[in-house]
Every structure is written in C-alpha cells, then in structure tokens.
Amino acid sequence: MGKITFFEDRSFQGRCYECSSDCPNLQTYFSRCNSVRVDSGCWMLYERPNYQGHQYFLRRGEYPDYQQWMGFSDSIRSCRLIPHAGSHRMRLYEKEDHKGVMMELSEDCSCIQDRFHLSEVRSLQVLEGCWVLYEMPNYRGRQYLLRPQEYRRFQDWGSVDAKAGSLRRVVDLY
C-alpha cells in the first residue's frame, strides 16, 4: 500500500490531502499543488484529470516545490499508485506494430541512443514490471508510465512523438 500527501503551498504548507490509492480526479481536494510528500510506494502524478496530460514519476521522498519533480506548473489533477513488481522486462521496436529491429531490456538505461543506437522508439511491449520512459537521456524531459501491455505506436503511451532518451524501472521497497 502506498501513501502520498499533496500540499497546496510550497514547503508542505497550506491545505493538504492524503491519498493511498489511484485517484482519477483530485480537483475536489485541492486547487493547486506546490509540494508533495511520498511516504511509501511509487506514484505517477498527472497534470489533468483521468490520468491525462504531463506525467511526473515520484518515489519515496519529499518534494518541497513542483520543480523538484520536474513539473511545468502547480497543476496536479490525478494520481496513480504504481504496483510493485519483482522483475522487469520490455522490448523496444524501431517501427510501429512491433516491427523492425527489436531490443530487449531488463535494467535501467540512461541513454537509449548510446546503448541501442536509436533516438526514436515507435512501439514497445512491456512484458514484466512497470517502467518510466523519459524523452531525453539521463532521465530528463517528459515522462511516460509504461505498464505491462503492448504499445503499438508512441501515441499509445501518451506521447506526441517517438523521442525516447532513457528508461527506468519502477522499483521501490514498500
């Protein structure tokens, strides 16, 4: 079980809301979010309701302002607790519909370009565990939660292009 607390103001001030499960609409609990405390679990925060918009991956720790989680604004409107998995495995494809060259991955990758000579990923399959895909190397830029399923094109994971810079396994000790 996870636990996350949202605060309207920076440095854990102002009205707060504690959450322990997925919530598709946080708007009724607070109007803005400027700081977050994650007591347990790994979470994906979303800029808009129903798990839409920019995504932000947070693990256990304190985030005194939204820049700490690479946020673009103080808008957090939904959140999802990411289930813990023991093992991780995924396949990256250079073309849509799982075609073209395939690379398999079971560990974090700080630079997809250096490791696989790819700057774009057009489809992928998450076989085990949850992952976060970052648009830039070294775990920077836009973030996308990847859960076990098939993604036949980059739009399936919520991206507007096929840019893929790095991948990180979602790992947390509850």
Swiss-Prot record:
Residues 2-40, 41-83, 88-128, 129-171 form the Beta/gamma crystallin 'Greek key' domain. The modification S-methylcysteine is found at residue 23. Keywords: Eye lens protein, Methylation, Repeat. Residues 84-87 are annotated as: Connecting peptide. Disulfide bonds: none annotated. Belongs to the beta/gamma-crystallin family. Has a two-domain beta-structure, folded into four very similar Greek key motifs. There are six different gamma crystallins identified in mouse lens. This is Gamma-crystallin C. It comes from Mus musculus (Mouse).
